[in-house]
Amino acid sequence: MPIEVLEEMKNDLTDFRGTGMGITEISHRSPVFQDMLDETKAYLRQMMKLDDDYEIVFMQGGGTMQFLMTGCNFLHTRGAYADTGVWAHKARNTAAFFGETYDANTAKDRNYAYIPDTYDIRPDTNYLYICANNTIYGTEYKDFPKVDVPLICDMSSDILSREIDFNQFDMIWAGIQKNLGAAGAAFAVIRKGLLEKARTDIPEYLQYQTFVKNDSTYNTPPVFCIYTLNRMLHWIWNMGGLKAIEERNKVKAGLIYDTIDQSGGFYKGHADVKDRSMMNVTFNLATPELEKDF
């Protein structure tokens, strides 16, 4: 996190918004927390330019919990997964406890060095699940699938790193820790029409509707994590919003990619150029011996 955000957080650990209590001490049922929660949702809604047709919820836990929740809420018959690497594969395997899952495509044939652009969607499929950015293999969607089933997207590792049309998704979820704050929580943006199709034959705690109905306070919310998200959103806004952040990210990633491309083969990028991630630059050296020295 930026040093100016950390300095602000340091002060709020002893006195949050003039309460005389630190952010880790305030009650999660207090007006000051509710104000901060509402403000955080408003930041997200404004920054993502979301239609009114979306709900925003915050939950304890990270990505692994969301692998479970997406499956147990929306998998009635079968779910399609774009196999672009480890995280989509883990999500599919977890959801398989609740119904049939299958790969709508796969990049396994080339060790996940690219993003496939065709999708085999079978009848009675409830959704297509994708991972926007693949940290291990260094690939990232530039254009998103246009399919006739709800589109669910894990954006944990590139959320709010660039300007995109967030309204093209039926659900987006992200662990906060990658780009936007402290580890231990996730948030989800879910289209109301998809929520209406969610299963109710699962424990109440695992239902997204439970968090919607209780404004993310069905149980003790991850107060500090939400607070760090709030401060990061405030910082992004002050930096000029997503357009400015995207330009910064392009410059930073470009410095490394240019070094790889101009190395005469000493460094070899893993991902296809058109699918390169702006968040995670992956490369190998010319020989295994050089990699050991590196």
What are the language-model segments listed below?
Residues 1-27:
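N-terminal "arm"/small-domain region of PLP-dependent enzymes with the aminotransferase-like
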Residues 2, 176-257, 272:
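Active-site C-terminal subdomain of aminotransferase-like
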Residues 75-89:
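Conserved PLP-anchoring active-site segment centered on the Schiff-base-forming lysine
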Residues 152, 166-177, 186:
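Conserved active-site segment immediately N-terminal to the catalytic lysine
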Residues 268-294:
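Conserved PLP-binding catalytic core of the aspartate aminotransferase-like
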Residues 18-66, 86, 93-94:
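Conserved N-terminal alpha-helix of the aminotransferase class I/II PLP-enzyme fold
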Residues 95, 107-159:
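Active-site phosphate-binding strand-loop segment of PLP-dependent enzymes
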